[in-house]
């Protein structure tokens, strides 16, 4: 029961923050859902940090499964790319895919390195 509560609390916070960031960021670029990219890249950086530190099981449930699970959004990313492809805006779709995948990998690695440096004072 406690595990479900931890996941639920994290999920509520993550979903509300994702929604609010989309409301703030998406109007800036009307032809690109910047809010989705922003939350996914932030989520990648944050999960990288969690990989670089030792979290207890309860912390993982709250933050990784709950918060990051609802904060990041693969389904919105997929929907946005699909809309570009179906409207024959292939280059925009490819740009969104590239930004999410390359940016996500780079920020996950950066998060790991930052956490390792924070914990041990070294990047390895």
Swiss-Prot record:
User: What GO biological process terms does the UniProt entry carry, in alphabetical order?
Assistant: cellular detoxification of fluoride
Cellular component terms (Gene Ontology) = plasma membrane
Name where it mostly resides.
Answer: membrane
**Which is an annotated Pfam family here?**
CRCB
Q: How is its activity regulated?
A: Na(+) is not transported, but it plays an essential structural role and its presence is essential for fluoride channel function.
Catalysed reaction per UniProt? fluoride(in) = fluoride(out)
Localization, UniProt:
Cell inner membrane
Give the UniProt keywords, A-Z.
Cell inner membrane, Cell membrane, Ion channel, Ion transport, Membrane, Metal-binding, Sodium, Transmembrane, Transmembrane helix, Transport
Instruction: Tell me how this protein sits in the membrane.
Output: Multi-pass membrane protein
The portions of this protein that span the membrane are: 5-25, 32-52, 61-81, 94-114
**One MF annotation (Gene Ontology) recorded for this entry:** metal ion binding
Q: Which residues form the signal peptide?
A: none
Residues that, per the record, bind Na(+): 69, 72
The function of this protein is:
Fluoride-specific ion channel. Important for reducing fluoride concentration in the cell, thus reducing its toxicity.
What family does this chain come from, according to its entry? Belongs to the fluoride channel Fluc/FEX (TC 1.A.43) family.
Per its record, how is this protein called by name? Fluoride-specific ion channel FluC
Species in which this protein is naturally found: Haemophilus ducreyi (strain 35000HP / ATCC 700724)
